[in-house]
Structures are given as structure tokens and as C-alpha cells.
From Swiss-Prot:
Protein name per Swiss-Prot or TrEMBL: Probable RNA polymerase II nuclear localization protein SLC7A6OS
Gene that this polypeptide is encoded by: slc7a6os
Acidic residues: bias regions: 232-255
Superkingdom classification of source: Eukaryota
Keywords: Cytoplasm, Nucleus, Protein transport, Transport
Length: 313
């Protein structure tokens, strides 16, 4: 099959996810055993964000596939698929309250008969399924022009978190300056300004286009859940990068530290020889000076004795 596409409708002020993980049931083939997993996960990467749902998706999807080499790090390795699936199942209930994706329509390529409206919350029971909404009607009209597209298309809506998760403390923390309580009204002026500034586009919607390359398991059906892909360790290289060591950070007690380098034995022997030579030279100079003084004194004595004898005669 060709690439599958998720078109997610979200408010302009919300942040899009870099990637989505879609989990769905997989149809077993005759060659597969019963022990093989009946659930498969697929990663959808963010290709582009468009302002209108009527914009053609072909160019964005094909451009994203052409630069797929720079996005390969978003694909989870085969060893980590099982771990990701278990972690997502464990935290599915909590994450669902934070970010919910509701499917409003599903369209297979080049087949109008197979197009199905899927108005339900992913992972919820049939009691939570709402009736047809305005989003479904808009998506149905918008996807009529994409029925002949060469990829499977799912229209979704990113719903906002529940209000109980967004509630803040009724009494904000007191701000003190030099033990004096500050007036909070001066701080809320800027917040009001920001709210009025963003009021123009807070209710506007944009559409995030996510794509996934051809799947080996056929069409995507029986979707279990769609969650943001948040495994940060899968998005970076597992090889640690060498850290820079600065001179003021190295340990002087380490054996390989440059400050602890000792001179070679040959240099030490040569130093000792020259030190002995200089010491011997100093002793010889001292002895020669002492002998000269003794000779000088004896000479003076002899001269003095000769002068005394001359006076006697």
C-alpha cells in the first residue's frame, strides 16, 4: 500500500506533536501462529502544517518522504517496539486525559465505497461516542476532493485537556520584596494584554499533516489509540559524545594527570652527576682559597722575622 496520512485539526495556540504513534489490530495471515502479536504500532511523522483542510496533501507528503533520510531517527528500533508498546499501554489512561485524538473520518485511496465515518474517541467505549458533529460534516466535505488520493487518509481532532487538569490554585503564592508584600494587580496587567493579543486566533484552527510510509500489514483498521511519541531516548544517538575537559576541572590526584609526570631515570642520573661535579668544584675552590690564606700569613711572618733580625745587627 501507499503512505498513510493523519490530518489532525488543532487550535492555533496549541503545540503540535513531533510524531504520533498509532496502534491498531493486525490481521493475521495463514503463515503466522497464534502466539504472534495481533497488535501493531506505526510511527507517523509531522510533515507540514496547513491553514485550511482544503489544501492538497500530495505535495506535502511527497516532499516529506523525499527528505526521509533526515527523519530516520524518529523510527523506533525493532528491539524497542515491544517496550514502547508496554509503556504506552501503562500510561494510556493518564495521557488520554492530557491529549486526546478523535477520529472523525477515514478514507481509503481510490475507493469511495470504503470511506467510513468514524466518530469516536480512540480507546473509549461506545457510550462515550458522540453524535455527528460539525467537525465530521466539515471533514466529509473536505475529503471528497481527496478520495482519489494515493494514500489512506484519517481526519482527527486534537481535543483540549479536561478543565480539572488545568485548574490552578485559587490563592496564588504571595510575592515578597524585602519582606513587603507586592501588589499583584501590576503583574496581571501584562497577562491581560497577552490574552487580548492572542484572542484573535485562539479559536482558529490549523491542520497538522502526519505521514507514515508503506505498511507491510495492509490497510490500517481497528485503531486502538493514537498518542504523541515522547520517547526522547529514541530520538537521539545512543553513542555518548566525548565531553570537553577544561584545565580547572581535571583532578590533580589522577595517575594520568599531566601535573604528575615524573622525569625519566636517565635525566635523573645525568642531573645527579652534574650536581656532584658542581659540588666538587665548590669544595676545590674553597680549599684553594684556604691554602692561599695560609701561604699569605706564613709569608708575612717570614718577612716580619727578617726585619727583627736586621734591627739587632
Amino acid at each position: 500500500m501507499e503512505a498513510a496520512v493523519l490530518r489532525v485539526k488543532r487550535k492555533r495556540g496549541a503545540d503540535p506533536a513531533d510524531a504520533l504513534i498509532l496502534s491498531c489490530k493486525r490481521i493475521r495471515t495463514e503463515d503466522e501462529t497464534k502466539e504472534s502479536s495481533a497488535v501493531t504500532t506505526q510511527v507517523f511523522r509531522l510533515a507540514a502544517t496547513v491553514k485550511s483542510e482544503n489544501e492538497p496533501l500530495h505535495k506535502y507528503v511527497r516532499e516529506a518522504i523525499s527528505r526521509n533520510q533526515s527523519c530516520l531517527t524518529l523510527r523506533p528500533s525493532s528491539e524497542s517496539k515491544q517496550r514502547i508498546q508496554e509503556e504506552l499501554r501503562a500510561s494510556k489512561e493518564a495521557e488520554r486525559q492530557v491529549s486526546r485524538y478523535r477520529i472523525i473520518s477515514s478514507h481509503r485511496p481510490n475507493s469511495e465505497e470504503d470511506n467510513v465515518g468514524a466518530s469516536h474517541l480512540i480507546g473509549c467505549s461506545s457510550q462515550d461516542v458522540p453524535s455527528e458533529t460539525q467537525d465530521e460534516a466539515e471533514a466529509t466535505e473536505a475529503t471528497k476532493s481527496h478520495i482519489s488520493s494515493p494514500f489512506q487518509l484519517f481526519d482527527m481532532v486534537q481535543e483540549e485537556p479536561e478543565q480539572k487538569y488545568l485548574e490552578k490554585d485559587s490563592e496564588p503564592e504571595t510575592i515578597l520584596c524585602n519582606s513587603i508584600k507586592m501588589i499583584r494587580e501590576h503583574l496581571t496587567v501584562s497577562e491581560a494584554g497577552q490574552e487580548s493579543e492572542h484572542r484573535e486566533y485562539v479559536d482558529e484552527y490549523v491542520y497538522d499533516i502526519y505521514y507514515s510510509e508503506a505498511s507491510q500489514h495492509g490497510w490500517i483498521q481497528d485503531i486502538l489509540y493514537v498518542q504523541p511519541y515522547t520517547e526522547e531516548q529514541e530520538l537521539v544517538s545512543e553513542e555518548p559524545e566525548p565531553e570537553e575537559i577544561y584545565e580547572d576541572e581535571d583532578d590533580e590526584n589522577e595517575e594520568n594527570n599531566w601535573r604528575n609526570d615524573y622525569p625519566d631515570e636517565e635525566d635523573s642520573d645525568r642531573e645527579e652527576r652534574y650536581i656532584g661535579y658542581y659540588e666538587d668544584g665548590d669544595e676545590e675552590e674553597k680549599s684553594a682559597g684556604h691554602a692561599w690564606k695560609m701561604y699569605h700569613r706564613s709569608s708575612l711572618r717570614e718577612i716580619g722575622d727578617d726585619d727583627e733580625n736586621a734591627d739587632l745587627y
